[in-house]
Amino acid sequence: MSSPSPPAPVACAAISASEKVDGFTRKSVRKAQRQKRSQGSSQFRSQGSQAELHPLPQLKDATSNEQQELFCQKLQQCCVLFDFMDSVSDLKSKEIKRATLNELVEYVSTNRGVIVESAYSDIVKMISANIFRTLPPSDNPDFDPEEDEPTLEASWPHIQLVYEFFLRFLESPDFQPSIAKRYIDQKFVQQLLELFDSEDPRERDFLKTVLHRIYGKFLGLRAFIRKQINNIFLRFIYETEHFNGVAELLEILGSIINGFALPLKAEHKQFLMKVLIPMHTAKGLALFHAQLAYCVVQFLEKDTTLTEPVIRGLLKFWPKTCSQKEVMFLGEIEEILDVIEPTQFKKIEEPLFKQISKCVSSSHFQVAERALYFWNNEYILSLIEENIDKILPIMFASLYKISKEHWNQTIVALVYNVLKTLMEMNGKLFDDLTSSYKAERQREKKKELEREELWKKLEELQLKKALEKQNNAYNMHSIRSSTSAK
């Protein structure tokens, strides 16, 4: 049985008179109006369907025989929606609904035996009526989550209480999933997941907790929830490149992954490699990278054999033009190295440290600094020491060159400390590499001098030929002139 459809929508705020007159209002003016408004509503109602609420008796004052019927009446009363974009309309009814929702939250939280089978339908109907709606497009088409303030839901005074009631309902000792599954089904969950695209971070925070509770209590919905999150992420990566609730969904996934049974199913491994790793290419990575990295590390703690393909995947998608992303990638690599098995480290040390060597050489000091901080990690240092014969030859040239040439003195100081540490790990190899590096530099200088000499000779030869050509031309002209004179 699917969840009931929400009631008719509530009326939207009218377009301003200035915008009616001039459809091409200057962008700066429209932006100022948006910033001033800062609230939006996705719930609308036609002007002809005004509803006035009347207060019902308090549940605590009703007899035990009357309470259940009164409880259902209050749930039905709370299905009425109001236009919060109009701050002066329906004030009395809005306050009655707010007080009723508060009473329902307290009633479900403090009383046992109130969530009976007959109430489930009205409870889910009230929740659906209030929270399920089509989210409006962003007020700001150029909305940047990292810089711009989000548009907050104007009807939050009511919606917040509905979410609180929903959570108390799910967490109640009287809650029975076997009954609730008739109403909280795949359609209900699909609508819930769509709400994660809300711009309001308060709503997404409630949704995160609600979905996590549903995942925990409804075993039959778990595979469906994972599949739908997978679909949202794939659309985000390959189609829309925009979804407000990515961080919250990843946070839920982190907890889900932590509970995966071993050995991991093929579908879970595929999700890691085909969805989570490609998500590192997203433009707004900074908004959800912490949660994404946590999910990746959770997978590696479950199955260490995934370490090699994960690191190779990160190296494949390594940022080439965004230093901020490089710093994030380096942070994630350190988190992975914190949990890596020594046997797995040997498989990826060469390609990984080639990339770290490039980062150390970066002219962007934050990238170089973040890469050099690896040498402050005791466990990573122990892995480097065990494999110094492979790692030192990869890193040496970059480190030695930076110690002489980098523009940032902080980086130079860090490099000296790293070189000192590496020298203590294997002094003989360090000396051999120093000698080889200096000899190579001498050879390069010699080749450079030879190239310069060659170019000099070529220029002289070219000049000589030009002079000869000029002389020949002059001689020919002289011969023609003398012949003409005769």
UniProtKB/Swiss-Prot annotation:
Q: Name one GO cellular component term.
A: cytosol
**Which UniProt keyword terms apply here?**
Acetylation, Centromere, Chromosome, Cytoplasm, Nucleus, Phosphoprotein
Pfam families in the cross-refs: B56
Q: Does the keyword Transmembrane helix apply?
A: no
SUPFAM superfamilies reported for this sequence: ARM repeat
GO annotation (BP), single: negative regulation of protein localization to plasma membrane
Location in the cell: Cytoplasm; Nucleus; Chromosome, Centromere
> Family per UniProt?
Belongs to the phosphatase 2A regulatory subunit B56 family.
- What protein am I looking at? Serine/threonine-protein phosphatase 2A 56 kDa regulatory subunit alpha isoform
Gene that encodes the chain: Ppp2r5a
